[in-house]
C-alpha cells in the first residue's frame, strides 16, 4: 500500500515578510477564494492566524468595493 506524500504547508505571507495584506492586490486575493467565491480556510492554505484575519478583512473590503465577486456567475 503506497503512502500519500503530503506537501508541508507554510505561510507565504510570513515567508515573503508581508506587513499588511492590501485589499487592492486582487491577484493575491484570488488565490485565497474558491471558484464559488468562498474564503479558503487556513487549515487548507497553511496561512498563519494573523494573516488569515488580514486576508479575510481584505477580501471583504474588495468585495464591498466590487473588486471581487461575492459569488460565482450563476450561468
Swiss-Prot record:
N-acetylalanine carried by residues: 2
Keyword terms of this UniProt record: Acetylation, Ribonucleoprotein, Ribosomal protein, RNA-binding, rRNA-binding
Any one GO MF annotation of this record: mRNA 5'-UTR binding
Gene Ontology terms: cellular component: cytoplasm; cytosol; cytosolic small ribosomal subunit
InterPro entries with a match to the protein in the record: Ribosomal_bS18 (IPR001648), Ribosomal_bS18_CS (IPR018275), Ribosomal_bS18_sf (IPR036870)
Function of the molecule: Binds as a heterodimer with protein bS6 to the central domain of the 16S rRNA, where it helps stabilize the platform of the 30S subunit.
Protein name (database record): Small ribosomal subunit protein bS18
Amino acid at each position: 500500500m503506497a503512502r500519500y506524500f503530503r506537501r508541508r504547508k507554510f505561510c507565504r505571507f510570513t515567508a515573503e515578510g508581508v506587513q499588511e495584506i492590501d485589499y487592492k492586490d486582487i491577484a493575491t486575493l484570488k488565490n485565497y477564494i474558491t471558484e464559488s467565491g468562498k474564503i479558503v480556510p487556513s487549515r487548507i492554505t497553511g496561512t498563519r492566524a494573523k494573516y488569515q484575519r488580514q486576508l479575510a478583512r481584505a477580501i471583504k473590503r474588495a468585495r464591498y468595493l466590487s473588486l471581487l465577486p461575492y459569488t460565482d456567475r450563476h450561468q
